[in-house]
């Protein structure tokens, strides 16, 4: 799933008044978390590059990267939809809906983390014995 596909899908499922840039930043925060907490903890994680998504007027000059692939692939890409829905609900002070959306996100995030753990070797830590 690409960044623009995730945002378009959320806009269809949960009409909202938040800008494309807001949702882009939220997706960047989540993929940064995925990279830092999950991917980097396993061998080969440093080979997978991640550049945060930023609005087109960002200083990095790369534009919004709307066609960039999100880090979690199918079938785990649903977590992005749940995450954006949760952020929208929280920002709208709809806390009951937020709790539901966040629980769905956490379940999807956990499923991705567990699958990544099964499929990749963990980094070993070097120990000094002196």
Predicted regions and their residues:
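Short helix-capping/linker segments at secondary-structure and domain boundaries
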Residues: 88-98
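Hydrophobic alpha-helical segments
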Residues: 96-101, 120
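Surface-exposed peri-terminal alpha-helical interaction modules
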Residues: 30-33, 75, 96
